[in-house]
Every structure is written in C-alpha cells, then in structure tokens.
Curated annotation (Swiss-Prot):
Organism: Novosphingobium aromaticivorans (strain ATCC 700278 / DSM 12444 / CCUG 56034 / CIP 105152 / NBRC 16084 / F199)
Classification of source organism: Bacteria, Pseudomonadati, Pseudomonadota, Alphaproteobacteria, Sphingomonadales
CDD domains, sorted: Ribosomal_L11 (cd00349)
InterPro entries associated with the record: Ribosomal_uL11 (IPR000911), Ribosomal_uL11_bac-typ (IPR006519), Ribosomal_uL11_C (IPR020783), Ribosomal_uL11_C_sf (IPR036769), Ribosomal_uL11_N (IPR020784), Ribosomal_uL11_N_sf (IPR036796)
Stated name of the protein: Large ribosomal subunit protein uL11
Stored SUPFAM superfamilies: Ribosomal L11/L12e N-terminal domain, Ribosomal protein L11, C-terminal domain
Length: 143
C-alpha cells in the first residue's frame, strides 16, 4: 500500500546550498520533516549543478514524516539573465529596454526548459520563453 501523503511544499532552493535557515527550516519544520536530512539529500542530489543556481523544488511529505523531493529546471528568467549578462530586467518593460536577446538563444533556453513547459513542440516553447524575455524588458532580435 502506498504511503499517505500529508502535503506538498514548494520552494525555490539554491543548488548545493540548502541550509536549515529560512525559508527551508520553517517550511519543513511546520510539517515535522527532519530538516538536516533534507538539506543533506538535496545538496548531494544537486552537487553536479552549478552552485547557487535556483531550483524550484516540490517536497512531498508523508504521514510518517518521511519525504521525497523533485527538482525542476531553473526558472526561465535565470537562463535569460545569464544569456544576456544582466542582473535584472527593466524596471519599466515596454518603455525602457534592458537589452537584446537573439531568437537562437531563446530556442536554446526553450530546449533546456522543455520538460517543465506546457508545450508540444520547440516552437511553442520558444514563444513561451520569448514572452518571459519581453516581460523583462528585452528586445528579441533575429539571429
């Protein structure tokens, strides 16, 4: 028989940098999960990924206080900022431009994010990523 699920916790945790400090500690502590055990398992699972990369993580907590977790690909904005070389998007998207990004770069990002996107093909995924780039105040150019 499968374990009874008590709940899900969604967090964005930096790869290889899980610590029992907020926001991880309080979120897991409320559910009675062993915080240090999660930190050890998460850091071991993400040691191959560049340290500090934000990873959306879904933690499934069971009735016996055990847990499992699934990490997803980093947010599209993380990839976009890295590709363009900026720290943040435009404060006023649509008015002030934060830079430019090539459509080929968007396609690469879409390829990396494909499994987490609600898209059937690479063209649809590229359009989703393009929307994120435009929302950050970037101008999309051909190339």
């Amino acid at each position: 028989m499968a374990k009874k699920i008590e709940g899900y916790i969604k967090l964005q945790v930096a790869a290889g940098d899980a610590k029992p400090a907020p926001p991880i500690g309080p979120a897991l502590g409320q559910r009675g999960v062993n915080i240090m055990e999660f930190c050890k398992q998460f850091n071991a699972a993400t040691q191959e990924i560049e340290k500090g990369t934000p990873l959306p993580t879904v933690i499934t907590v069971y009735a016996d206080r055990s847990f499992t977790f699934v990490t997803k690909t980093p947010p599209a904005t993380f990839f976009i900022k890295k590709a363009v070389g900026i720290k943040s998007g435009s404060k006023t998207p649509g008015k002030a431009s934060a830079g430019t990004i090539k459509r080929s770069q968007l396609a690469e990002i879409a390829q990396a994010k494909m499994k987490d996107l609600n898209a059937n093909d690479i063209d649809a995924a590229t359009k989703i990523i393009e929307g994120s780039a435009r929302a950050m105040g970037l101008t999309v150019v051909e190339g």
